[in-house]
Amino acid sequence: MRAADPGPAVVLVTGVMASGKSTVAQALAERLPRAVHVRGDVFRRMVVSGRAEMVPGAYEEAAAQLRLRYRLSAMTAGAYAGEGWTAVAQDVVLGEELAAYVELVRTRPLYVVVLAPEPRVVAEREAGRGKSGYGAGWTVEALDRVLREETPRIGLWLDTTG
């Protein structure tokens, strides 16, 4: 089934790890007539050496690299939208960084979709995945707290518990 063409736009799909961002963003992009899926994690993986991982209480270098990743993602999505595409950007953008990301995207319209399943469901999904998003100091509960208590209510928030 094809979705109506929103025309050139940026759609940011965000949420905690294992909330369904990749699945939702890919499914949305596949249903649009002219769309790209901008995966924020690709920019993180481009760093070959010197990468500083974002963990609780991260050093300034990790935060700077995260903000660079967001800038690159926003610029890439905006460039595609500027050429007539619907750019579906997907990344973990939480807390005060969500408002900052919205400011980075110059293209309008910009749609923000926040996936917010219950923590127990996130833990179940994480356990069933081939990759691990948690660890290195993050727990499902800690990241869920950042989502629900520190992230501004921008865009459409969806409980994707199922």
Task: Annotate each predicted stretch with a short phrase.
Residues 13:
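Hydrophobic anchor at the beta1->P-loop junction of P-loop NTPases
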Residues 16:
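P-loop (Walker A) phosphate-binding loop of NTP-binding proteins
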Residues 19:
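ATP-binding Walker
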Residues 22:
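Walker A/P-loop
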Residues 26-72:
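Conserved substrate/cofactor phosphate-moiety recognition/catalytic segment
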Residues 64-111:
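Glycine-rich phosphate-binding loop used to anchor ATP phosphates in small-molecule kinases
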Residues 91, 106-126, 158:
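Conserved phosphate-donor/acceptor-positioning beta-strand/loop module used by diverse small-molecule
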Residues 128-162:
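Small-molecule kinase domains that catalyze NTP-dependent phosphoryl transfer to phosphate-bearing small molecules
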